[in-house]
């Protein structure tokens, strides 16, 4: 009898701890008028440090304080070192070899593609995985160099440890009003500045004015093209790091927009 009572108490304690490890939270990023302000279930809300690591082009790894790993736009052969990575989530903004090399990523990640099979129609993504919320925003990329066509792609928002991180995707123009409504609040932008096929430095600066993030990390550019110098035009405080990663939390965000340039070597630079 005593054994039965003890077992019941152990079970109740276990269930209580399991319940406490989850929390209902309203999104800090999504516009409640768009999202319906519906709460989502996460593990106990964390607000610890988030690591953002850049491998080149549009390829990042975002790691939450609880260890959840997100990979964005893994590339194929582009002249960058090929990292050995594993992830819980992989996002693909467009179907191109520079962005969709999912096979590179180890583990059994959930793969989220901004476009449906065939790449002609946008998908609607809204996923909660452990302590991370992921949703996407439809964008357009310029098609061919004469801009005669426009290709579809997707930007992604990651809500991690209370931070709202936007991966811009291969966007070609500043956001329109509908896109801004879908995006919501942004703390950090991983921002394309490459020009030609995507938005260039001047257009990217307009996006900063639209979203007013605290941190902007430029991507999708080569150091030798002068694009970075045009982007760091003195409008915002900027710094160049001698590393390919930063660690940031809600409490360590700068008071005003800061451009942070991460360093990635190409194979020939090693």
Could you say what each language-model-derived stretch is?
Residues 26-85, 89, 113-184, 244-270:
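Core dinuclear metal-dependent hydrolase active-site scaffold
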